[in-house]
Amino acid sequence: MSMSSCILPGVGKPGFVLKENEIEIGMGIHGEPGIERTNVKKAREIVDILCHKILKDMDYTNSEVAVIINGLGGTPAMELYIITKEIDEILKTKNITPYKYFVGNFMTSLEMAGCSISLLKLDSELKQLLDAPCNTIGLKIGD
């Protein structure tokens, strides 16, 4: 979901243009236009739309999931955590248990304002791997 495009390097202009009251849903990480546009809405309404699109692709009922809320480069952390709270509430109403959240700027699109949401359905092996220590530039888990 994006509330703005990014300025494409070498092109010098946005990949798409939104009206003042529009958001783009399903845009590409490189600034490509999305699959639909809608008017700006409250956080819960936007997250409802995004979760509906994600949850219709796979049955997550009675599952544990890892959730990634990825900032696109121009979104304050506070807004990402508002989105996280809304996702948490929605998942719990659908009998989906969030095991771990990753919230931050993991794969940005320059200065684009918005976020992407990813769910990973977990089994015991994936949970063990997610909990394993790692120390990279983009992610640190454990000591």
Predicted regions and their residues:
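Mixed-charge interfacial surface used for oligomerization/domain docking
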Residues: 1-82
